[in-house]
């Protein structure tokens, strides 16, 4: 009977034999999520959501709490690692045409929006100079909403300016949203295993499947272990590599920061926002940069699912990756020439990908049919 149970467990999740390392980022994201919830819990024990005490409580965690600096830096670096894994996970989905599994893809986009909101609320909590100005600038975008904008902003602030109620609300939201993320992640995984994982060839995996354990579980374990090893190295050698020194100074409402740089996590979306001089236009660009990811499932025109055998689409895809890196880089720079021009051009390229890709895929199909 025990042998039958072992056989049942080992064959519980049949997976295509040829899925590559790019499929490992899902398990890495789950590891990041567990790490963030765990370190966040220990930080919440010592954190005080008060504008006069928040900054001091973060300093207290770093200096006085045993291993507090490890928790604080792991949480900060872990968030950046989380988003790096997410962006690679999304890029893999775009490259291999995984968006054709519509339910999984759309639940993933919802998950991304929730994660970005959580990261923003968390960025505000230390209440340093950069946190204060990021909160002021980003929440002010809500005033661009016609008719309701000012009322919504005042409601979110809990008054007519960013103050103690704002920080308390952001703390409560940052605490509750990870539980929503866990729920959405569960839905995402359930929907994925409803149809099963795709593979790099984009073919049906039913004819050649192997048990997930031990073949793929060990592969997942290797990349997850590599990430966990990278974390303490980064923690020890350069904990502020992905952060801004302005966050280490107390907030001063009278003096604006040189350039309000968002967290490394949401820098790409912030870069798109900054590239448009109009407030409403910038806000729409920020929203559309995420919502446009819902288009590929409905605009796929190629008869071949992945870009593996489509050289023109591949070229366009790698242009998108270069564009994304450029947007992220310009978002960390001051709002002055030539960064404004670079930011505007890269923003046009970013949105153009989602329009040009279906047209190029259709052209490729026509060329292949003729040859």
UniProtKB/Swiss-Prot annotation:
Q: How does it sit in the membrane?
A: Multi-pass membrane protein
Q: Which CDD domains match?
A: Cytochrome_b_N (cd00284)
Q: Which UniProt keywords apply?
A: Electron transport, Heme, Iron, Membrane, Metal-binding, Mitochondrion, Mitochondrion inner membrane, Respiratory chain, Transmembrane, Transmembrane helix, Transport, Ubiquinone
GO BP terms: namely: mitochondrial electron transport, ubiquinol to cytochrome c
An example Gene Ontology molecular-function term: ubiquinol-cytochrome-c reductase activity
Its main localization is: mitochondrion
**Annotated residues for binding of a ubiquinone:** 193
The residues that the entry says bind heme b b566 are 89, 188
The residues that hold heme b b562 are: 75, 174
Q: How is the cofactor bound?
A: Binds 2 heme b groups non-covalently.
Instruction: Extract the Pfam families matched here.
Output: Cytochrom_B_C, Cytochrome_B
InterPro entries given for it? Cyt_b/b6_C, Cyt_b/b6_C_sf, Cyt_b/b6_N, Cytb/b6-like_sf, Cytochrome_b_N_euk/bac, Di-haem_cyt_TM
User: Which cofactor is essential here?
Assistant: heme b
Any GO CC annotation of this UniProt entry = mitochondrial inner membrane
The further comment given in this record reads: Heme 1 (or BL or b562) is low-potential and absorbs at about 562 nm, and heme 2 (or BH or b566) is high-potential and absorbs at about 566 nm.
Per its database record, what is this protein's job? Component of the ubiquinol-cytochrome c reductase complex (complex III or cytochrome b-c1 complex) that is part of the mitochondrial respiratory chain. The b-c1 complex mediates electron transfer from ubiquinol to cytochrome c. Contributes to the generation of a proton gradient across the mitochondrial membrane that is then used for ATP synthesis.
Name recorded for this polypeptide: Cytochrome b
């Amino acid at each position: 009977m025990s042998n039958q149970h072992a056989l049942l467990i080992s064959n519980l999740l049949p997976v295509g034999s040829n899925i590559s390392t790019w499929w490992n980022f899902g398990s890495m994201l789950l590891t990041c999520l567990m790490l963030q919830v765990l370190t966040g819990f220990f930080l919440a024990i010592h954190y005080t959501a008060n504008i006069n005490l928040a900054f001091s409580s973060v300093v207290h965690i770093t200096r006085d709490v045993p291993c507090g600096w490890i928790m604080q830096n792991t949480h900060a670096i872990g968030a950046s690692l989380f988003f790096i894994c997410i962006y690679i996970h999304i890029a893999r989905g775009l490259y291999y045409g995984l968006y054709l599994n519509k339910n999984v893809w759309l639940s993933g986009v919802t998950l991304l929006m929730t994660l970005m909101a959580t990261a923003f609320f968390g960025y505000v909590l230390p209440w340093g100079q950069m946190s204060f100005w990021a909160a002021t600038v980003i929440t002010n975008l809500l005033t661009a909403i016609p008719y309701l904008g000012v009322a919504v902003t005042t409601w979110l602030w809990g008054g007519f300016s960013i103050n103690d109620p704002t920080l308390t609300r952001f703390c409560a939201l940052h605490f509750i949203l990870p539980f929503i993320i866990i729920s959405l992640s569960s839905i995402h995984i359930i929907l994925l295993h409803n149809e099963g994982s795709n593979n790099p060839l984009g073919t049906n995996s039913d004819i050649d499947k192997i048990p997930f354990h031990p073949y793929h579980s060990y592969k997942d374990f290797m990349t997850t272990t590599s990430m966990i090893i990278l974390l303490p190295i980064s923690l020890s050698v350069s904990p502020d590599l992905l952060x801004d020194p302005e966050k280490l100074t107390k907030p001063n409402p009278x003096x604006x920061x040189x350039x309000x740089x968002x967290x490394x996590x949401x820098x790409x979306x912030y870069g798109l926002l900054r590239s448009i001089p109009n407030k409403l236009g910038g806000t729409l660009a920020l929203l559309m940069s995420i919502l446009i990811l819902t288009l590929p499932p409905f605009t796929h025109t190629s008869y071949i699912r992945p870009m593996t055998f489509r050289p023109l689409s591949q070229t366009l895809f790698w242009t998108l990756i270069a564009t994304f890196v450029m947007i992220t880089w310009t978002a960390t720079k001051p709002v002055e020439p030539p960064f404004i021009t670079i930011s505007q051009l890269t923003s046009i390229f970013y949105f153009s990908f989602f329009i040009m890709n279906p047209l190029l895929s259709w052209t490729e199909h026509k060329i292949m049919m003729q040859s």
